[in-house]
């Protein structure tokens, strides 16, 4: 999908785990089917997941992103009642894979694209509670920007207005 995409497989993840985390050697590794294009996710045994960045250009940037995501997950875990993936190890580049990667707690459940939660009142309440919890986290001077992820809300006004107008029959 991406020009700089790094190929990954369950065999590669097994080799990385065996070399870097011998305590998890022998655990079964299987790819998690996901629509994501930024990370590949592999189930490791019953309690872990390996997340491998798929964009191969910048190992230092990948490490910063993984460390930042782990810090954000810790902060999020304290702000809501909902479980979040907890990073338990940070892997290093290895033979066949040029980037740092993460091992985190496996969270059981299903992704939102597996079911249509549109008519679920409990889901809507949970989502509202989660968003309120996230909004209550103090930004502490941090700036959030990025294409489609954060930034100045007024820059997204036209797109959101279009989405809301086209969703009138659903809302």
Give the residues covered by each predicted segment.
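ATP-binding pocket architecture of kinase catalytic cores
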Residues: 2-3, 26-170
């Amino acid at each position: 999908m991406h020009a700089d995409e790094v190929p990954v497989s369950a065999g590669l993840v097994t080799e990385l785990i065996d070399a870097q985390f011998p305590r998890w050697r022998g655990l079964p590794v299987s790819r998690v089917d996901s629509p994501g294009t930024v990370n590949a996710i592999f189930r490791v045994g019953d309690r872990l997941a390996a997340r491998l960045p798929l964009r191969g250009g910048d190992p230092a940037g990948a490490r910063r992103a993984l460390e930042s995501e782990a810090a954000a997950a810790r902060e999020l875990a304290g702000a809501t009642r909902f479980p979040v993936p907890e990073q338990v190890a940070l892997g290093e580049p290895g033979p066949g894979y040029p980037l740092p990667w993460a091992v985190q707690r496996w969270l059981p459940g299903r992704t939102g694209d597996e079911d249509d939660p549109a008519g679920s009142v409990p889901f809507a309440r949970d989502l509202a509670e989660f968003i309120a919890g996230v909004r209550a986290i103090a930004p502490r001077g941090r700036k959030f920007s990025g294409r489609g992820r954060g930034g100045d809300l007024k820059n997204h006004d036209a797109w959101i207005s279009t989405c809301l107008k086209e969703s009138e029959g659903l809302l």
